[in-house]
């Protein structure tokens, strides 16, 4: 089976549509975050079914909860594996700027969340890297290492001087 479009996302369905999917069995395509940026790939569900994903150019990244296929009693959805991340909680705008500058010099991508997010605080999140953890310990910036399903995949940052 070739998947050429995303039918919706389980986490964003309006209440009026959510009921239609409530009784369906969820077959999952479990992917690491790095695979979410590929619009053409071959995947296998947790039931051993092989699928091809071929999304049109300009399609957004795959996300946790994306619905790939719906049949009578079954649906196939994307399930994203947690990513090993550092959740950095700077105490001031100065501390945030210094840490963000250091991460930028290392070409690491960061995602930013505010107090209204699932983190319930103003934080920046980057993929785990032992040198970043050592740096944060050295400068005394509060952080926590966590396993998280990120809403947006981290992308490799191309760079040249």
Curated annotation (Swiss-Prot):
One of its GO terms (molecular function) is nickel cation binding. It comes from the Bacteria. GO terms for cellular component: cytoplasm. Its main location: cytoplasm. It is found in: Cytoplasm. Keywords: Chaperone, Cytoplasm, Nickel, Nickel insertion. One of its GO terms (biological process) is protein folding. NCBIfam families: PRK13261.2-3. Belongs to the UreE family. Involved in urease metallocenter assembly. Binds nickel. Probably functions as a nickel donor during metallocenter assembly. This is Urease accessory protein UreE. The lineage of its organism: Bacteria, Bacillati, Actinomycetota, Actinomycetes, Micrococcales.
């Amino acid at each position: 089976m070739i998947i050429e479009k995303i039918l919706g996302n389980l986490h964003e369905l309006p209440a009026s549509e959510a009921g239609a999917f409530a009784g369906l069995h969820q077959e999952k395509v479990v992917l690491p975050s790095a695979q979410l940026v590929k619009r053409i790939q071959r995947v296998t569900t947790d039931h051993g079914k092989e699928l091809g994903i071929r999304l049109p150019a300009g399609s957004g990244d795959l996300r946790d909860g994306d619905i790939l296929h719906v049949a009578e009693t079954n649906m196939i959805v994307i399930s994203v594996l947690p990513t090993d991340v550092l959740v950095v909680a700077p105490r001031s705008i100065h501390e945030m700027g210094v840490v963000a500058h250091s991460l930028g010099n290392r070409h690491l991508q960061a995602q930013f969340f505010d107090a209204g997010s699932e983190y319930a605080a103003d934080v920046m999140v980057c993929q785990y890297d032992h040198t970043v953890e050592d740096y944060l310990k050295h400068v005394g910036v509060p952080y926590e290492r966590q396993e998280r399903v990120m809403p947006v995949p981290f992308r490799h940052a191309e760079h040249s001087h």
